Amino acid sequence: MNHLQVIREDKQLRILLMQECDILFYDQFKEVEFSQNNEVYSLSHTAFAKDGSGGEYVILEDESIGFIGSEGQVGRVAESLDDLLTFLLHAGSISDFSCRLLYKNKELLAKFCQGFTNKIRENYQSKGEVWDKVRAGLAQELGLEFKPEKLQELALKFYQSAIRTPRFTCKYGHAEDEYVCDSILSDIIGLWVSDLVGMSREEIMNFSN
């Protein structure tokens, strides 16, 4: 967790990470904000950062990284802080890569990752910026690797962390009123996914079977 202290002590780096990777680091560890409804989490944890929507990143008891979303989704997202930061440097956020069906077919995931990279480069170019240069500079400050061609590999690592056991889950309520929080992986195929792979929802579903 060496990067944690470095980031906490560097205000400019924290601002850059929020702007580029949608992660705002807290000054210190804190209890998660989503603990007011008698939630029972499967693993002990402590919050160290949040995203723009209010979801929180937590360090789990095995030192892997979990995420508790503002819309009720819960799960593991990385095996270490370095892995999380490396993924975010390439992906920008975890939500864009949360569609479970993408990981059922390597060709489909490859198409999505290439489409994502092309689109994000276009977006930066429209602002007069070079995505590769911006992210490579941030990676250098963090002492981490930035290789866009490895996005598919990094996405698979994210997926594998999310599905491995013991899973990071949450439930609340009692008996018939007990509710289990959604996984961070979703079966929803958004327009974003369809646009990037150039396929309809039905085509994606057939492709992933």
Where are the predicted features?
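A surface-exposed partner-binding patch
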Residues: M1-G72, C99-K104, F116-N209
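Compact, glycine/acidic-enriched structural inserts
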Residues: E71-E107
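Eukaryote-specific, cytoplasm-facing alpha-helical/coiled-coil scaffolding segments in long proteins
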Residues: K111-C113
